[in-house]
Amino acid sequence: MPSSSDAINRISYISLVTSDNDKFNQTFQFYSQLGFRLTKSFSKVSSYGSGLGANHPEFQLGVSHDSLKEVWLESYPLQNVDSNGNLRPWQEMEVYDGDNCERLNESTVIKVRLLGETPLKSISQKQFVFFTTQLNKIEKILTDANVKYGKVVDNVILAEDPLNNIISFSNTQNELCKTRFQSPEEYVEKTTAEILAKRKKSQLGSKFGSFEEISPSEVGGGNGLRKKKIGVMTSGGDAPGMNPAVRAVVRAGIYYGCDVYAVYEGYEGLVKGGDLLKKMEWSDVRSYMSLGGTSIGTARCKEFRERAGRLQGAYNMIKNGIDALVVCGGDGSLTGADLFRSEWPSLVKELVDTGKLTKEEVSPYEHLTIVGLVGSIDNDMSGTDVTIGAFSALERITEMVDYIGATAASHSRAFVVEVMGRHCGWLALLSGLATGADFVFIPERPPKAGLWKEQLKEVCLRHREYGRRKTTVIVAEGAIDDELNPITSEEVKQVLADLGLDTRNTILGHVQRGGTAVAFDRRLATLQGVEAVKAVLEMTPDTPSPMIGILKHKIVRIPLVDAVKQTKAVAEAISNKDFDKAMSLRDNSFYDDYRYFRDISIYDDGSKQLSEDKRLNIAIVHVGAASAGLNAATRAVALYSLSRGHKLYAVQDGFAGLVKGDLKNLTWMDVEGWHSLGGSEIGTNRSLPSQNIGKVAYNLQKFNIQGLLIVGGFEAFTSLHELSEQKANYPIFEIPMVVVPATVSNNVPGTEYSLGADTCLNQLVSYCDAVQQSASSTRRRVFVVEVQGGHSGYVASYCGLITGALATYTPESNINLRELQGDIDLLQKVFATDRGEDHNGTLIVRNEQASAVYSTQLIADILKENANKRFETRTAIPGHVQQGFTPSANDRVMAVKFSLKAMEFIETRNGCYGKHDRKFSDEEISEHSQVVIGIHGDVVKFTCIKHLYDNEANVALRKGKTVHWTDMIDVANILNGKSLLKKQERY
């Protein structure tokens, strides 16, 4: 007899080999009698001598290449039977909870093979151990087959198969199990009960729907510390981006080991309590990213303004164990939250004194933590460059004015558009820049009382004389003159009507709040929501309540009281007629935006023209792939040039056109309406100066070009480097040249932002939302979405964050099998308990150059192969749709800023400014004439092309060396569950 170490227990698969045809048939017959069922039969040579199996490859799947014959025998798992004795389907059994759930027991497959030559003989005899619940039936089968057998103990039968393998049968599952089963029914009943009990225990302590099974909350709670409970609420007017903020707070809170409660209906939910305070699970916020408004509701609550209301709010928070509050709202909501915190100790004391709560109940809640998120479409909060929802509202306004512009041009009408903003003119000013408005009225820079009507008439009439068929005037709802008299849209309408214009008045109203958040707001809200949770966990009772803001493109914490105080100071400055102070209290770029609007819309009357000797000939050329913002930048440069007296030449069809000498002098009407046009009206391609550098120099000299703007992506960057390197041979290349980055890939060294990237991301938001809706509607579907970006992972990382993708593959991350396996594990957990009711559709985002091996289709196939039928996969490739049709509002505004800043650089290098009028310091312009304009934080700066090319450019991969979007990758991994899965593996 073999030793116990030679025994093979709990067999799932075994291959038995012989070269004797009789023994092959005997072995097949032996195991068939024991209850194994034939599932596959293969023979290379049939009984008639024809090679049936050999001629049909589909019959050979899984068959060993050296087998003449094979039979596959399988013992199926034990299952329940119905009243007629028929097996019930596995999916109808009580223990079934998805195809990957634990089974009652595993099946066994025996492959019997016939070889043409004698196989190697085994050194030792092997023993196979089979589990059975019917030993008496096994004895009868062996007896009827005249097979000798014996018993070692009363519950183990030993026998030999025709190939002399020792097989044993036992009615215990393994050596550690003491239970001896006497019937299939007994085993099924007991095992079913054990599986259900184990599952119930697992679901009580951990359930992936809430991500508690991989949450590190046990780590924080296991050391005797009370688990932090955070409330999140939205208050005041709704704003796009509030839902992504709530999603971020909920999931980041769970990730950091906290319980998170949604306070429904704003402060009203805090006062009323009950069902309006709901503990949130991971899956509760699954679809929040693509929803506009706020799904947890908002309301203006009069009760909370009174101490009695705040007292009741404190009571409800303590009863639910909540001692931290993240409030997303405007300045009024955040002021109320900070007042609540300052009163908290006295409110707690009053609750004890009145007997509503005991000292023991309130002792863990002596201090309240408040963190503010600014959700406001007005962008009127000081201390932050932009508020959640502002860019979404700007996008809505821009879209509506574009629509209005179409009908206005058709009928040659004038439209007065009133936008929201209260005491803040940000929406009015930037929408004026983005839509090419003739005039804007904002409270921070009011016109002269008694004179503004004539000024308005003069500007609008002049533009009509230039050939414009429509007139657009944007009025902020808080617009005033310098004597604080309100300027209403009706008044403005009457002024235009007096000019004889067919005028209409449009108040956009709450349409500005509507719709889903744009890409920028989704990112802003998500990053700020995660930062809010970190602030809650890091604050002490002495820490002032912070407001989470964004300064220089970095998420920061600002004392809430200071921000509110400074915000109110703007209104006070306006009421005191100190308009310069009001302008200075706005974000850093507000004054520049106002200055640029005047340059291209008001000062085209010739009042700011330079003297004849300082007027320049400037050329602009588009290089590389089309990108949103090219035309908007060209329009801004053309209008600025006309207002300053310069000549602007548009190079047709890139550097190929410059080689031909195909340049056109642009007029005012040539660029009319270009602010809203995508693509390139003057033509663009990937041709470089090096194709005929001599001709490029000749035509620049021929047209006496004194400054060159190169608008485009990495080809524009390369073009400037080629021109700069040839300065010694062609002195004309000493003229100031500026690259204005414009590419969806955002891969130009020297800048963190390129024109067209925002439009691309907004396109991807719409595309991925639609794809995700399809995935959710069809249930259990995973889409692998391929996005552009070249070898830069910026677009993919941004897209993955703002669409809630489960995984993002970029060139920087290096896809490998280990990472794919981790994502497969995460997907399997996501779908493990899903029965189709959760609308559980999932996205994976892949950059087009993420891997030369793991293509989009291959990743989808690998996921599908490992899905075990729990989900299916599809691919989605938006392709050139990502370039967009109409530029986003943000791209239009940035096109004006970039291009006019570049023009000021060219003017400065050509000595157009006097000593006191210069726009740049000596350090900024230095000795370099060939530069790239870029954004670093919120600072626009110029960097020498030689420095960038030599030190910061990866020329081979056509991108910069700096990865400035790592924060998006880290936050995305927290919110998609990947970081949680890794923590589970560690703990």
Curated annotation (Swiss-Prot):
Residues 1-602 are annotated as: N-terminal catalytic PFK domain 1. Its cofactor is Mg(2+). PROSITE patterns: PHOSPHOFRUCTOKINASE (PS00433). Mg(2+) binds at residue 331. It catalyses: beta-D-fructose 6-phosphate + ATP = beta-D-fructose 1,6-bisphosphate + ADP + H(+). One of its GO terms (cellular component) is 6-phosphofructokinase complex. One of its GO terms (biological process) is regulation of intracellular pH. Heterooctamer of 4 alpha and 4 beta chains. This is ATP-dependent 6-phosphofructokinase subunit alpha.
